[in-house]
């Protein structure tokens, strides 16, 4: 089993913390360590999210004002030099360095920093121009699928089959944190018709659920598991509550070495009723997932000029516009 330790912004923009996180992920048994190429300069100003929208007591758009989000992201950025040093350091401890690309304009920059393995967030699974460019430029893609409609996923798989040197599809649920009864882990087997390797990106609440969702995913055939990773107290970072430690990684890897029958027996003994996580292989996105998709899909784009942040001045990841 491959384990991707997702550092996200749990490093708080501090490269010394990044290196310590890499060390602990390696000690836990991770195979991959991932950062995110999130840059405030790529954040689009969209008026509908400044105050959010409620109609007849129903949320139509979440509230996420641009300026506070810009300021927050700006303080979490790693420099280009630090990203290149991240690649070198992860490789020096024998693991695979990864990053998530959030804007088409960053593809070449990421390649120049030495990355060869890329994660595509589920909100960009249907950003077909960027997906194609990433597939052509890098050696391997891990593509999350949680916020993607089935017709979009089928087309994404066609793009990957045609252009990618290698790829995996990851099931996830874009609800943070994800309740166990909303996991729909049967989706993992369903994804195997579109990829030779499938996996799971887990967003469950660690303090409540531990590693049960990830273990159940492995018992359902996940060959890759991705989880947010931290060395800090969960209260210190935005993603802390859904982030695990090296001890959690070890427990999952030990579990993955059991036979499938023993895995299910352990789940039944330690987590009676775990089958509630299986859910449906084919399903519609929940209202919460649709609201998150509405905000996060199109959150980042490539500015047409320095300092631009309005929609008309940005190239979206799903636009065929040449950069």
Q: Predicted segment positions?
A:
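Catalytic cores and adjacent flexible loops of soluble metabolic enzymes
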Residues: 1-323
